[in-house]
Amino acid sequence: MRPILLAGHERALTQIKYNPDGDLIFSVSKDQQICVWFAHNGERLGTYRGHQGAIWTIDVDPTSTILASGSADNTIRLWDIKTGKCLKTWDFPTAVKRVEFNEDGTKLLGVTEKRMGHLGTIVVLDIKIDVEAEQSDEKVMTIVCDESKATVAGWSYLSKYIIAGHEDGSVSQYDGKTGDLLYNIPIHELNQPITDLQWSQDRTYFITASKDKTSKLISSKDLEVLKSYTADTPLNSAAITPKKDFVILGGGQAAMDVTTTAARQGKFEARFYHKIFEDEIGRVRGHFGPLNTVAADPTGKGYASGGEDGYVRVHAFDKGYYDFLYEVERERQNRLAAASA
């Protein structure tokens, strides 16, 4: 897998997102700009300028019409993907650490930071997927996290629940319409923050990454832990691959804790685990510094990772990736082939 190296940022990457068709990659970093790239060849399409602080998060609506970003300048901004025009700015008392559209793109949630006497919150905004439309200033719903602040959050299937990962390692399920807390379950080690939360394609389950060196596959409906993946380094990001039953984990020693310069020492690799059997099946090296974000191409053709080194690396899967099967999987395939013959 020879990667395409995307060098468009001057500082550490914070999040990468593919659009739903998998043909565009959006990347954000601490250098205050959003870049958009063609996924197949790594050509830069353009940048979206306007934020006045590090950008923590990005999301694309299901039709690839508008883009939402959250930043340390205490704003969420909405952009016209095609023209790069900023359509709307919402102001908050603290930094915005995560944004995510729901399945049909009509709502956007934002996770705000706990700072300066303000509690961490999850806010919901109504969105019109139309670049000409006037977007509403009103926040439809605000969930206050008075126990432990939310670090990540997202919408489950049919926008039924809002799922949030917290700084204390717990996961919460809120009612998507009323904002009522339904469950709060300790999933990761106490006080080991959850660093990422990414969905399966149908949003019935999701994967978390945590500083406790583990990643969990969890059901959206009842927050039951379905699978657990153990790594040897704190994790910053985790993604579920479509087409094949794998998950990709990214992490590495925190940049400030790295004392040796050898890339192997810091464990700066993307790790592939089998989603069902929980075994590590391979690693992809390349970043010079921790991986801050990984994203799987929704069409199943590859994945991208963004590191503390300021680079985005886009990998296209080769034949060996698709052919790889466990013995039991191969036997099952042969049985099915024999049955249909």
Curated annotation (Swiss-Prot):
PANTHER family according to UniProt: EUKARYOTIC TRANSLATION INITIATION FACTOR 3 SUBUNIT I
| Keywords noted in UniProt | Cytoplasm, Initiation factor, Protein biosynthesis, Repeat, WD repeat
One of its GO biological process terms is: formation of cytoplasmic translation initiation complex
Classification via Pfam families: EIF3I
Question: Which domain of life does the protein's organism represent?
Answer: Eukaryota
* HAMAP family attached to this UniProt entry: eIF3i
Where does each WD repeat begin and end? Answer: 8-49, 50-91, 135-184, 189-228, 286-325
Taxonomic lineage is: Eukaryota, Fungi, Dikarya, Ascomycota, Pezizomycotina
Protein name, per record: Eukaryotic translation initiation factor 3 subunit I
The places in or outside the cell where this protein is found are: Cytoplasm
Has keyword Protein biosynthesis? yes
